Every structure is written in C-alpha cells, then in structure tokens.
C-alpha cells in the first residue's frame, strides 16, 4: 500500500499518516518505515519514528517478533538472546556517558536518517521499544517488517497557500525565522534554477537570482482560517518580497502552486541528457546555517560544472534537496562526481548538519556515516548491525560499509532507449494506477526492461538479449492496456502505452497488418460480420464454440483471436444515417454498439429529443471509427486510413466545426480527440456524451423520482478527458446516494485486450470488485461511461453495469411535457 491509498481511507475518519512525503503517490508503507520518511509538514514531530506504534518483524535468524504482543519483550529475549543482551549493554553504556547523550541529542534535533537511530537508546527504556525504533530507517539491514501499526494524526482539511518570491536565496532564507513564527504547516524553498525548471509565472519579473518560499497554513476548522490568513498576511507584507503574493484557499490555484514544487525533481531529471543518471541528494542543517549552506552549495555546482543543478526542499526544517545529473560511463565525469561529493560532505558537516535527512543512508552515503557521527558512535552502529545480522546476509553494504568508495561502485547506468520513454526517472509514480501491476509489469518496469534490453545489446550478451526480448512479448507488450493513465501520473508526461504500441508495430507481421488495412477499407462490412458471428455463436452449444475458439487461439495465437465467453452481449446493429434540417450537434455513434448490443446510443438520442435538441450524423457513419483498434495494436497504415476517412466525414457533417461532435462511449471520444490532435488547422470540437449531457441535456429535462443509490466506475478515458465532475453531476441528478469505490481503476478491457487476455482484466478489476463486495450494499444501478468497461466490470463483479445515460434516460422526462 502507498501513503496515498492509506490516507484516502483514513480521510473518511478525519485522520492521516504522520509522514507526508511529496512522493506519497508512490511511497509504500514499507519504504516509509525503512527510510524513516518524513516530508513537507511533519518535520521530526510526526515522522515514522515518532508515529510507529508496533511492527511484526522477521529476524535474520528466522524468528518472528510482533512488538504489539503483550509479552514481546520476553519473546525477543527468548528468541534472540544475544541481540537482546547487546541492546541492553549499549543502552547502559550510552546512559553512563553524558557526552554521548549530548552528541546524539544534537544529531537528532534536526532531520537525520544517517546510520541507525541511536536516539532510540535515549528516548526509550524498554529493550523491545529500542528494538522497534532501531528498525525504523534501517533500510532492510536489520530485519524484514511484514506488518506495522501507526498512530495517526488529525487531517487538517482547510488550507491557505502562497508563493513568496525574493530577490535572492539569501533574502529568502533570512525570512525563515520570521515565517516560522507564524506557525505554517510547510515552508518549501526553491532556488532560481528550480523556478526556471518549474516554469514559474514570475508576474512580469525577469528571473535573475530570485528564490521562492512556498508557504502553507493548515487548520482543522474553516472558521479558524480567516484569522490565520489575516495574521500571516501582515507578516508577509513586511518580508520584502518582489511579488504581490496573496494567500489563497482556491483549490485549483493551490494545486498549481504545489504542482511546481512536487514536479521539480522530475522536471529537472526528466530534462537531463540521454544516458545520464539523475542523483537527488538530501541534507539538513540548523536553520541558522541554511543560507550559507545553500550559497556554498551553489558555488560547488559552479566549480564542478553542474550547471543544471537545483536546490529545493523543506526549509522550515533546514532540510534541502539538490539534484545533479552525471554521466558515470565517462571516468573523468565519475571522478568529478566523487570530488564533488567529498566537498559537499565536508560542507554539510562543517555546518553541523546531517548528510541524510529523510531519504535514508543507502549505499551512496554509507562511506560517510563514521565521518558524521565519529568513531565511537559509529562503532556502536557496527555492533548493532552485527547483533541483528551476525552473518551479514541482510542488505550487505547498505548503511554500514567498510569500502570508502562503495558509493562509486555498481552505479546504475541509463542507456538510451526509445525517445518516448528515454527521460523516465523511474520514480514509480505510474505504478499504483497501472492495471497490469499485479499481473506482469508496470510502466516503470516496462521501461526498465527496455533499458536492460539495450544494455544486453550493447554488451553483446546475445543469450540474455534473446531471453529478455522473449519475456517482454507477454510481460511488456501483450498485457499492457495502453490506457494512457500512466501519463496522467507521470511527472515528465510519459505515456508508456505509446512505447508499447511502437513495440507492437515492430512485431506485427505483414499479413496481419494487411488484414487490418483491409478492415479499415471495409469497416462497416467487418462490423456486420463480427456482430453476426456473435449472434451465430449464441445458437451453437457453448462447448462446441469454446473448443473451436481454443483451437483457433492455439493456432493463431492469443494476440490474434479473442477468447469467446457466454457473458458477451449479443451482436449489435449497423449504425444508420440520421439527418436534421437544423441540427444542434453531430452524433458520432461509436462502432462498439455495432459489435455489441447496447442501449447507450439510443438513450442519447432519446435524451436529446426530450431536451429539445436535434442531431445529425455523418452520411457514411457505418464505415467510420475513431481508430483506436488500429492505434492500440500498432497498425500504423490502417490507423491512418480509417482516421483520414473519419476526419473528412466529420468536417463535412459538422460544417467545418460549427457543430459540436458528440460520442457516446468515452474511449471513442478520447480516441477521436487523439486522432485530430496533430491537425493544427482543425476546428472540430469533440465532446464526450456525459459532458454534453451534463451541460446541455440535464438543464432541459426533469427527473421526477431518484433512485436510492448508485455506484460509479470511472473509466481511464473519462479520467483522461477530465469528465469525472460531469459523471458525478449526472449521478447526483438521478440518485440520492452516489459512491465511487476507493479502489476503482482501469478495468483493462481496453477494446479487445480483455477478450484477448482475460487474465489482465481479472487482475485489474480484483481490488475494485473486492471493495464493492466489502461494502455489502446492493446498489440500484452500477454505472460507467464506456461499453467494454461495462462488460469488464460486469464480468468482475457479477453486477449489471450500464452506461449512465441509459439510467438517466429511463428516469428523465422533458421539461416541456
């Protein structure tokens, strides 16, 4: 589970986790514990160390300890007596040394995740509590944590945010003491290079040596916010900022401000030169030393030629991050980084700081732990490691290292790959949203596999190359839904689906491509044939159809022949031309309902009539398509052919864009929009049916009686289209209660992908189906926005999903009647 998914559930109870990393979309709970994560607001008061209540731990000797058990201390003594005794001895030694207590206290007065948490020996008296808190931030070197219980903190739901821009970095950091006195939840620092990378609106100010502080105040009750804002604004006005910054509570504006800060790492790392590695460092210093530290860091960047380096971070805690890009394949540049690191370490330690504040020691800082803590405290850390892991089997070389150059060894290279994915920073933001994450691979892993293939090719390792390429056919290509949701989560805007369709293009044979090219030329007839096939199949005993279907899939391959199943709808009917003397819009009925029987198109037509709106269709509608079937399969020629025919018909039918074009299935709407994206001269306006219904139909119809409850399944396409508000508006118009499962996600039916690989849809829908079952409620309707998604969700849940327009039409009547 990630921090975001856990917090989404806690929010219902007005609570949240203490640690609040900026990368909460990807941070797993295990990683948060392993690194002693903190974040933007929690500081050291509500970090993992302070809020972890208990954990179940697997030790190196195979024993399991649950620190939540009432006799856990006795269990630890019995199951790991040497460890228990060593921890007790260290506790006694430290307690008898005021000088050690003083130094440990100083080290942990600031954010500090270097080495092991020696503050455990000061903060806790029982051995089991010391044991638990040593595990926090130990990065898997002391044991494996399988379960954990946290103490949560109040969720402060009301906030005001501003971006204060200063003349230079020194002015920004000098304002910190004054700002901290106003009790903000967060103060985020961004230097000039960060502002440039984040493309900050400087409100007419020419960017020179400027720096900014993102300041946010959070309260639990809305009534408190006005007074907090007024008091803070008075202070802000005296800070000498170069902009007229105003605190805002407006969600959109606040999100835009935070987007600048949260996207900085990826913006800089994503723009790096191909083949280079992005390194994000994380240090903390006393607040009084922050200004000089930042200025001296900038001097180091200049000295060593890191011209694209940026500084940003949690200024309220004296915790800054800086990022440099390096090409470690070049020995001279690798040596440059080594020299820079040595000077950076000296700089931070000379300021009384910590070389790691919240990211964990890892391998990169392991050689410098002793330099920060001194020989005596470092020796205690070595004893801790040996007591927990006598054989040294747990993450060797991490956190504790005898190799002074371990940070320069085993560097991960990023060989150039396909341009569409080459700037991936492997942050993992895309992973939680990927429908194939529990079946095969995620977007990040697909890209990593491409890098592994490139490395094997470069190294001439033909055996490994062949193995990787073969494995990638299923794990990378065949089980990717190509839904594009990864792009919505990716801070550098990578759509891994485009990478996958490129790979599919390379694999497609000439015969296969020609068949689909012919289908594009005769699409209406092709749809009729598919529809007839579905209807004929229903007349034949299922055992015969299933056997024939299996044989075809075995012979032609599961990528070519869909798996037939009894729950598939009947075949649909051909789309027919409809004319109007004074149309209000063009209805582009999708070809999905020519394949499968459905009521969505007729419902949209009916609702339009009830609302008093007239429509027309392209005369050749039966032969048109958005092109998604070809595009998703990497069939370039067929895609161009069908899209060109569709575009010409829509230009004519819409009177060159005068009339909006409405499509009833969200995936087809999104497909149409993508198809015309590259046409800079296009005047076409494509609107999804739920947006159209919310804006133009709903005001002109009545819903005499609402349903009691409905549940929604947003689709990947409706999400990419930004149609969720319209979806909820329609749902609230027809139901007293509307809910969306927290675990909703792309169903991965993806046109025919769920029929080609039903295991993909089964995996993708498992969590959402389980969430619905857990609610234990029978809803009056199960609603979505796309036909194939409705098929996939019906299959997963056993409930009859339908398009929301069908439900609206059944309840609606004209306001004129």
Predicted features and spans:
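FAD-binding subdomain of flavoenzyme oxidoreductases
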Residues: 3-170, 181, 391-401, 405-406, ...
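C-terminal substrate-recognition/cap domain of FAD-linked oxidoreductases
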Residues: 120-128, 132-339, 345-347, 351-352, ...
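Short glycine/threonine-rich loop-to-helix capping motif typified by GTGT followed
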Residues: 196-208, 255-264, 321-336, 365-377, ...
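Activity-critical C-terminal alpha-helical subdomain
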Residues: 267, 367-416
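Ferredoxin-like iron-sulfur electron-transfer modules
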Residues: 369-371, 406-426, 458-482
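Iron-sulfur cluster-binding electron-transfer modules in prokaryotic oxidoreductases
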Residues: 389, 496-817
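Iron-sulfur cluster-binding cysteine motifs and their immediate structural context
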Residues: 393-398, 429-452, 479-506, 671-672, ...
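Non-heme iron-sulfur electron-transfer modules
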Residues: 400, 406, 437-472, 493-519, ...
